[in-house]
UniProtKB/Swiss-Prot annotation:
It catalyses: (2R,3S)-3-isopropylmalate = (2S)-2-isopropylmalate. Catalyzes the isomerization between 2-isopropylmalate and 3-isopropylmalate, via the formation of 2-isopropylmaleate. The gene is leuD. This is 3-isopropylmalate dehydratase small subunit. Keywords: Amino-acid biosynthesis, Branched-chain amino acid biosynthesis, Leucine biosynthesis, Lyase. The keyword rRNA processing does not apply. Pathway: Amino-acid biosynthesis; L-leucine biosynthesis; L-leucine from 3-methyl-2-oxobutanoate: step 2/4. Signal peptide: none annotated. Gene3D superfamilies: Aconitase, domain 4 (3.20.19.10). NCBIfam families: leuD (TIGR00171), PRK01641.1 (NF002458). One of its GO terms (biological process) is L-leucine biosynthetic process.
């Protein structure tokens, strides 16, 4: 995985609550086993009209949101089934950070495992960000090392994160990568057991 220490990007506002994994990546697109290629199907039923054209009313289809790399959403984001395809689609679409007041537990952990930083902020902070980025391009800097979210206009917030996941993201490790750091010790242990 690519290390994530600090990320600066434009926000894309999805002012909806209880966005479930079926809405993030609909079931008909779950036939792939590799982690790439899912971004084109992100929020498919909302992003596109039945004829396949972009839905002009969908938040992420607005010109200022199309280049967003930080998704700002409502509470309980990622609820529903535990499919890992949901964070795969979010990352493949181009988001590195998701900010919300709360996340479904499995989705929250799957984000870390796939190199996405899920940031829990207070509801009033998320509401303020949504107002700032609803109709215009709005840039944020998320500093994982300092655990802060800031902008040039003075917005500041802090967030909590488990030390394990923080270290994993900062170093760009997934769980296999973490294990491989101890490859020599594992080999020595295995050799001693023969």
């Amino acid at each position: 995985m690519e290390p994530l220490k600090t990320h600066t990007g434009t926000i894309a506002v999805l002012d909806r609550v209880n966005v479930d994994t079926d809405q993030i990546i609909p079931k008909q697109f779950l036939k792939r086993v590799e982690r790439t290629g899912f971004g084109q199907f992100l929020f498919f039923d909302w992003r596109f009209l039945p004829n396949g054209e972009d839905n002009p009313d969908f938040e992420l289809n607005q010109p200022h949101a199309k280049q967003g790399t930080i998704l700002v959403a409502g509470h309980n984001f990622g609820c529903g089934s535990s499919r890992e395809h949901a964070p795969w689609a979010i990352k493949d679409y181009g988001f590195r950070v998701v900010i919300a007041p709360s996340f479904a537990d499995i989705f929250y952990n799957n984000c870390f495992k796939n190199g996405i930083l899920p940031v829990k902020l207070k509801q009033e902070e998320v509401t303020a960000l949504m107002e700032k980025g609803k109709d215009t391009a709005y840039s944020l800097t998320v500093n994982l090392e300092a655990q802060t979210v800031t902008s040039e206009d003075g917005f500041e917030a802090t967030f909590e994160i488990d030390g394990y996941w923080k270290e994993m993201l900062i170093n760009g490790w997934d769980e296999i990568g973490l294990t491989l750091r101890y490859e020599e010790q594992i080999k020595q242990f295995e050799a001693s057991r023969v």
